[in-house]
Amino acid sequence: ISFRLAYGGAQERFGGRPDLTVFGKIIGGGLPVGAVGGRAEIMALLDPTAGKARVESGGTFSGNPLTMVAGHAALTKWTRDAVDRLNAMGARLRQRVDAVFAEAGEAGQLAGEGSLFRLMLTRETIRDYRTSVRTAQPMARMTAIHKRLMQEGIIISRIGLGCLSTPMGESELDAFVE
């Protein structure tokens, strides 16, 4: 999540300097990969050449050539302009979907931050994580909307989670809103 919010991650967006920062599959173009970064003295614990006690690190996909090539390709497209464009698209999508629900007199909104969103079928304003989890979703209605979106080629999770990606443009936003 943190990498999507700003080019420099959540720490750029909200300020602060974390001891550790973790990135998920977005850095691999959706393939199974992650990365950990942090202060030098913490990262030194992972250094196998340090000659002192360290933390073992590794994994099934560590250094996997396909994943590394995909990650390199994804990160060459992940520019400051691309992040800003996606986040602006996310804001427009949320505004447009919210307007559709309001005009129809229906309970619903698209909550989220940056290029991430969650369809919430409620009139209660979703301000934070707490309000999102205390709000019960009418699952029959959510299932019907999810099914319709899938029929139109729009993929979100069954609970309404979704995200925008760099190849998307205004036509994808239009399709979602319709």
Where are the predicted features?
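Conserved N-terminal phosphate-binding loop of PLP-dependent enzymes in the Aspartate aminotransferase
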Residues: I1-E178
